[in-house]
Amino acid sequence: MSSSEKVSVGIVGASGYGGMQLVRLLSDHPQVELTYLGGNSSAGKPYAELYPHVGHRIKMIVEPIDLDVIASRCQVVFLGLPNGLACDLAPQLIERGCKVLDLSADYRFKDLDTYQAWYKTERTDQDTNAIAVYGLPELYRDDIRRAQLVGCPGCYVTASLLALAPLFKQGLIQPETAIIDAKSGTSGGGRQGKINLLLAEADASLGAYGVASHRHTPEIEQICSKLASQDIRVQFTPHLIPMPRGILATVYATLRDPGLVRDDLLTIYSAFYRAAPCVEVLPNGVYPQTKWACGTNLCYLGIEVDHRTGRVIVMSAIDNLLKGQSGQAVQCMNIMLGWEETAGLPQLAFYP
């Protein structure tokens, strides 16, 4: 597609934090025209009523979800709906000729039995699921380029996989030893009122949740298994921390070769991500902070080796709402349409 063409884009599920980030990114994208905002409970409301701070730029009304209307106005559609809803809409939008990017979990799994077991949702869209491409550009850029439907990864998954991918792909670790300790800001829980996300509950507190049962676990394992060409199980524990946005995932694993040093791994990671404009491999002894990634589509990776234990430690920092969600979806759209991969994506953080 010509870089001079403006492509018409719509967002279904524009009222949540992910939808809001899409509105922000797409309204500033040089090659996009935002032509539709859709929702259920928010239908009929001016978007500025939901987010008053964008009223000077966004004059659109949130409309009911009507597939014929969407297809008539939009060449590309982002689905920012709760799990279990995109699988009803995506097949119909694809039939109508739209390119679709789904931010939910519906099209992340090639094995629908795994999805149904973890998300408790029956699926009848096997043919559509078969054409879905996993939306992690650093691993599947060529597939995304040819895709009609992209299932965008989860936020924890993105941070974890970018830390783990070189280790599994290059066979650098004992595969059964991978442990992921991840921490996320409260925006990962969405915009709906939840007791654990109240300021009085979350502030000045830190706690684990979804221990040994978080839904992102099988998603991480699916991709790690492909990279390692064997069945992989990981230990993944997420934590909620009292800040609005950001994820720090710290990965631990036992090295196959205890003689590897930090410089070796930095060389391997730098080579692995040499064509990845949204991944920054940090130099010797520099470890990432979530604030560095805030408001950007970047992932910062820091690497260390503990020779006492024979383990590699990889730290991965992202903005959960951007590289972990909406920014990565826009990155995938850019690739699908043959544009510069970073078009419309901020490269410098909100700082401090």
Curated annotation (Swiss-Prot):
Entry's localization field: Cytoplasm
Gene Ontology MF terms in the entry: N-acetyl-gamma-glutamyl-phosphate reductase activity; NAD binding; NADP+ binding
Keywords assigned: Amino-acid biosynthesis, Arginine biosynthesis, Cytoplasm, NADP, Oxidoreductase
Chief location category: cytoplasm
EC numbers for this chain: 1.2.1.38
Pfam families per the UniProt record, alphabetical: Semialdhyde_dh, Semialdhyde_dhC_1
Pathway the protein takes part in: Amino-acid biosynthesis; L-arginine biosynthesis; N(2)-acetyl-L-ornithine from L-glutamate: step 3/4
InterPro entries named among the record's database cross-references: AGPR_AS (IPR023013), AGPR_type-1 (IPR000706), NAD(P)-bd_dom_sf (IPR036291), NAGSA_dehydrogenase (IPR050085), Semialdehyde_DH_NAD-bd (IPR000534)
Domain of life: Bacteria
Active site positions, chain numbering: 155
CDD domains recorded: AGPR_1_C (cd23934), AGPR_1_N (cd17895)
UniProt GO cellular component terms: cytoplasm
Catalysed reactions, semicolon-separated: N-acetyl-L-glutamate 5-semialdehyde + phosphate + NADP(+) = N-acetyl-L-glutamyl 5-phosphate + NADPH + H(+)
GO BP, sorted A to Z: L-arginine biosynthetic process
Function: Catalyzes the NADPH-dependent reduction of N-acetyl-5-glutamyl phosphate to yield N-acetyl-L-glutamate 5-semialdehyde.
Name by which UniProt lists this protein: N-acetyl-gamma-glutamyl-phosphate reductase
Source organism of the structure: Picosynechococcus sp. (strain ATCC 27264 / PCC 7002 / PR-6) (Agmenellum quadruplicatum)
Phylogenetic lineage: Bacteria, Bacillati, Cyanobacteriota, Cyanophyceae, Oscillatoriophycideae
Gene (UniProt): argC
